[in-house]
Design a protein with these regions (language model features):
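Compact, glycine-rich, soluble single-domain proteins
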Residues: 74-99, 211-242, 246-248
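Bacterial N-terminal signal peptides that target proteins for export
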Residues: 1-8
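Bacterial N-terminal signal peptides
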Residues: 9-16
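Second-shell loop/turn segments in exported
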Residues: 29-35, 77, 128-137, 180-186, ...
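A short, solvent-exposed beta-edge/loop patch
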Residues: 112-137, 254-305
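Terminal, regulation- and interaction-focused segments at domain boundaries
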Residues: 22-64, 155-202, 210-212, 219
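Contiguous hydrophobic, core-forming segments of folded domains
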Residues: 130-166
Length: 305
């Protein structure tokens, strides 16, 4: 019989200012003048790759939005996902929660002042979601690598002042646990793949897409997979007044099982966090975000019963 326990983790991670430098905000926006138009999503992708940050998906959202909704909010708007497998695997040794920000995400967008901007999670934001200490050397290295990529992508750029809310009463993470039953001849990989197929068949009809999934091999795990997931009906209204939402979207669902442990863990950063983290005030947009959180939570509750 499958066993399930659903745990909503809501504690805010206390972070020392001394290890977070000047930026204790959960997201960061790096910006530079682009009046000549020489910088674009493709040049950003190449620059990230040059420093060892691999951009696996880099979507022109305006193309999607114009076809689906008939209008766009920004002259240029891309959502991209990126990783550094070496650092991710190091963090997996002790912190499977790294899967909740694997891949990392960014929005690449034009400003009204002819600037180009990139929004990503800061070190504080990475630590907050994963509960990996902000003093962890590998997490710091990851943050520094992102910083190097941003400077490479936007020469002479600078970080903009961000004053979003730091505290929230909402759950930071939505997490489930269950057990997989093995039938004759099955492996845990077989059952996990079956779960993945069922999961995707449930989320697709209600507007969720999986731009990319990752399978990591690691000696400590029977399996460790992450799914990068997006729902256009959420990101479209959010991005109108909050283009920096790309630091959170697409969001990642991690599913893993440690060797010697019967428990299968499934978790993702709660989508409802966007409301406070991005200072969303528009009622219709808030409703779209809450609907997206509830839909994903309900689907995973059903699948893990």
């Amino acid at each position: 019989m499958k066993k399930i326990s659903v745990m909503i983790l809501g504690a805010f991670l206390m972070l020392g200012a001394s290890v977070l430098s000047a930026n204790s905000q959960n997201l960061q926006i790096f910006s530079v003048d682009n009046a000549k138009g020489t910088i674009n999503a493709k040049t950003v992708q190449k620059a990230f790759g040059d420093v060892g940050v691999i951009v696996d998906v880099n979507n022109d959202m305006n193309s999607i939005f114009s076809k689906r909704y008939g209008s766009v909010h920004h002259k240029k708007y891309n959502l991209a996902i990126f990783t550094n497998e070496t650092i991710v695997k190091k963090l997996m040794n002790k912190y499977p929660s790294i899967g909740m920000i694997t891949p990392l995400t960014m929005s690449i967008y034009s400003g009204a002042d002819k600037s180009i901007n990139i929004s990503t999670l800061s070190l504080a934001g990475m630590a907050r979601i994963t509960k990996i200490p902000a003093t962890n050397a590998d997490l710091i290295a990851y943050s520094k690598l992102v910083d190097a990529a941003l400077h490479k992508a936007l020469p002479n750029g600078k970080y903009l002042s961000v004053n979003h809310a730091l505290n929230t009463n909402k759950e930071l993470v939505t997490e489930f646990t269950t057990e997989f039953e093995l039938e004759d001849g099955d492996t845990y990989i077989d059952v996990k793949n079956g779960f993945k197929e069922e999961f995707e068949s449930e989320i697709s009809p209600v507007g969720f897409l999986v731009p990319k999934s990752y399978t990591y091999e690691h000696d400590a795990y029977d399996f460790f997979d992450t799914y990068s997931i997006i729902r256009f009906n959420a990101i479209y209204p959010v991005s109108k007044n909050h283009p920096d939402a790309g630091a959170y979207a697409p969001f990642s669902v991690v599913i893993y099982k440690k060797k010697g442990d019967e428990t299968v863990h499934i978790a993702y950063p709660s989508i409802s966090n966007w409301i406070d983290d991005l200072d969303i005030k528009e009622e219709a947009t808030i409703n779209a975000v809450r609907e997206t959180q509830d839909m994903m939570k309900d689907i995973l509750e059903e699948l893990t019963e």
